């Protein structure tokens, strides 16, 4: 899949909205593009040839499902999200892990450096109703995680930093879901993952959690790991932490 180069739209009533988005992201406006950000009357979507329309979703219908999924996941055991805990999801992607963490009461800030993915996440957040906004603490900053961490003052360090780096092994598995296939092709491998982990360890209060393929050697030796069927969650403790 080539880099997203255009914004399309469902009908002429949405042309102005699509043009504004195209200008914002420095993309072309092309209603006939077969690979593009695609504006519909209901949501912003990602249109890819041979795939159905894809979109981020933080609506109420997904919360109970994701919370149920989360109870069975190493993600929750590793991050221990509870009310009042501040979690920084440094590599948001489609926002699914962030949404699961938020349903357990944590205050989750997503970072996403790819402008197309950030636009999809922003749209998903905007579609929430007021009740969802009050119930779930989930927000987004369109930023590179390394730059963001460098800008943080110590008093603003999160309790937990969660990192789910892109890595080449994801391309090799037939079990990879279509959303992850597209994300992998759109974003590519996170070659700065090691730098991000090391920087995170000096900008976090409690722990850094890294999601990594089960059979792949960790980038750094972890202090602990929680194994799943295909992935594991490597846990790193900053030296000054007492938790």
Curated annotation (Swiss-Prot):
Q: Which annotated residues bind S-adenosyl-L-methionine?
A: 112-113, 164
Q: Which cysteines are joined by disulfide bonds?
A: none
Main EC class the enzyme belongs to:
transferase
Any GO CC annotation of this UniProt entry: cytoplasm
Q: Which GO terms describe its molecular function?
A: rRNA (guanine-N2-)-methyltransferase activity
Q: Does the keyword Methyltransferase apply?
A: yes
The EC designation for this entry is: 2.1.1.242
**InterPro entries named among the record's database cross-references:** 16SrRNA_methylTrfase_J (IPR007536), SAM-dependent_MTases_sf (IPR029063)
Subcellular location, in the record's words?
A: Cytoplasm
Keyword ATP-binding in annotation: no
Q: Which UniProt keywords apply?
A: Cytoplasm, Methyltransferase, rRNA processing, S-adenosyl-L-methionine, Transferase
Question: Origin, by domain of life?
Answer: Bacteria
Reactions performed catalytically: guanosine(1516) in 16S rRNA + S-adenosyl-L-methionine = N(2)-methylguanosine(1516) in 16S rRNA + S-adenosyl-L-homocysteine + H(+)
Which protein family is named in the record? Belongs to the methyltransferase superfamily. RsmJ family.
Described purpose of this protein according to its UniProt entry: Specifically methylates the guanosine in position 1516 of 16S rRNA.
Q: What is this protein called?
A: Ribosomal RNA small subunit methyltransferase J
What organism is listed for this UniProt entry?
Legionella pneumophila (strain Lens)
- Gene encoding the protein: rsmJ
């Amino acid at each position: 899949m080539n880099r997203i180069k255009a914004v399309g739209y469902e009908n002429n009533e949405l042309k102005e909205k699509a043009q504004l988005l195209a200008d914002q992201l420095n993309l072309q406006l092309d209603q006939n593009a077969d690979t593009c950000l695609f504006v519909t009357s209901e949501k912003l979507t990602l249109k890819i040839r041979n795939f159905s329309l894809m979109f981020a979703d933080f609506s109420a219908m997904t919360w109970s499902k994701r919370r149920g999924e989360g109870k069975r996941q190493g993600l929750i055991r590793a991050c221990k999200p509870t009310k009042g805990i501040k979690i920084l999801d440094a590599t948001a992607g489609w926002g699914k892990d962030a949404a699961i963490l938020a349903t357990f009461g944590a205050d989750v800030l997503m970072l996403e450096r790819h402008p197309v993915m950030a636009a999809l996440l922003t749209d998903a957040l905007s579609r929430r109703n007021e009740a969802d906004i009050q119930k779930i603490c989930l927000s987004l900053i369109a930023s590179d995680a390394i730059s963001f961490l460098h800008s943080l003052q110590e008093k603003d360090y999160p309790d937990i930093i969660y990192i789910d780096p892109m890595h080449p092994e994801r391309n090799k598995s037939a079990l990879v879901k279509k959303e992850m296939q597209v994300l992998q092709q759109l974003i590519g491998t996170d070659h700065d993952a090691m730098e991000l982990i090391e920087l995170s360890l000096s900008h976090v209060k409690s722990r850094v959690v890294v999601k990594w393929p089960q059979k792949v050697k960790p980038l750094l030796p972890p202090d602990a790991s929680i194994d799943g069927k295909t992935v594991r969650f490597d846990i790193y403790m900053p030296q000054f932490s007492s938790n």
